[in-house]
Amino acid sequence: MRKILLAGVLIASVSPVFAARPIAAWDVVPYQRVDGTFAAGVVAFHDKSVKVEFTINGRKFGKTVESPSLNERTGVREFILPFPAGRLSEKLGDREYTLGARVVAEGEKPYELPALTVYANGKGTLGSKKTVWADSQNGNEFAAGDKSSPVKTLARAVKMAGDGGTVYLKEGSYSLKLLGGGFERKYWTLVTPAPGVDRNSVKIMAGRPGTEKLRFRNLNFYCDCDAGEYGSIVMGEGGKTSAWFENCNFTNEKGRHAGEAYPFGNKLAAYVTGGTTYEIMYGPSALLLRGHSVKSVATHALPGENALVVNCSVDDVRAADGASSVLITSIATPPSWAGNLIVSGLKASGLSCRVFSLRRIRDCAFADVAFELEASEGLYSNVAGETENVLFSNVSLAGQEIKLARSKDGRGDFKPTDVIMKKCVFGTLSGCDSVDGSKGFDLRDSKVEIQIK
């Protein structure tokens, strides 16, 4: 039985359920050295309930996890693998492990997540133990690098600290340019303000480090990108390098409407936990964005593909006069696909932009998301092209039209397969031929102000 009521009331239906694989991702920064029991979590979505089977080095570990629970390490509800790093180190010594996760929805195709590398380091034997101090104002590049005799540059400090060491920064400004160290580093090297140093007295300036696995903690990053200029604060090496940013801040000193500035560029594999991006044209494009705030950006506040965005917030997205602005963009042209995106637990407010522009996406979930508009006149969101295995669950977007693309020649038309919108609150939803699941699009248990067929 089915009932459709328009103009602001409930749409309820008994409809087909997903026939597609679960949508899931690790909520873990890889290559960590861990001890004790490390809670490695998976975030997963499907129209049906899911469960997760975990492996360590290819062997099944523990019981199948039937439901998510709060991971105290991340603050996120996850399917958790309690990785016994300490116990394994006691038995086998410190070493590398490969974690696996198989996400299963009853009667559907399971999904094997990409393998995750971690290091059991219960005995503390892995990686460099060296701590190097740097002082850009009073240091000496040929000094010993200890507290009383710091080096001058970040490049020298990173080299001396070694693979997995620690760099302490005293007050001053430090460049990311040409830090060196190559692409074969195995462990995260920590870079952080020295004990007792106010983070606001340490300034990290834009550059291309040219090395791998730098872990920045409690630092402020800046670029100086003026009108007509293009730049990134932290540049990658075409996908060969990764960086982890814990409680770090990113900004363009000239403001969001100046140059075309990005927090990350050239395919840096970025992992962002905590911190804030503000007064810069673009938000951070990261593989993992957890607990991060994005404020006062011009456009593209969040990643559009190949990312887990969880428990983040966005406030004040507005382009310069005459320019366009979109919160989330995920677009591909055949034969390529965009997507592989999870956005969960997002609160976005102060939006004067299109909320999303999606074309030819698959394997995406938008769950427990609220969008609050500051201004929306003449603006709309759209979904176009082939759209496969996409779930909108408990999404609130009132006051902006969502266009499911339709054209006279059929090019770029919305062609859904296993697309579900449930428990959502929308404004105008236009362009849908059928919403009962019979044509690949299932809208249920939702409130829609106006629906145009």
Regions found by a protein language model. Name each.
Residues 190-191, 215-218, 243-245, 263, ...:
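All-beta strand scaffolds that present successive hydrophobic residues in beta-strands
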Residues 184-238, 244-255, 316-319, 344, ...:
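Right-handed parallel beta-helix/beta-spiral solenoid domain characteristic of secreted/periplasmic
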Residues 154-161, 174-184, 201-210, 233-235, ...:
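Short, T/G/N/S-enriched strand-turn elements that build extracellular solenoid repeat scaffolds
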Residues 223, 252, 257, 270, ...:
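Residues in short coils/turns that link rungs of repeat/solenoid architectures in beta-rich domains
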Residues 116-156, 173, 194:
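Right-handed parallel beta-helix/beta-solenoid
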Residues 70-87:
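Aromatic sugar-binding surface patches on proteins
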Residues 86-96:
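Surface-exposed, short loops/turns at beta-strand junctions within beta-sandwich domains
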Residues 19-40:
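Short, compositionally biased P/S/T/A/G/V-rich stretches that sit at domain boundaries
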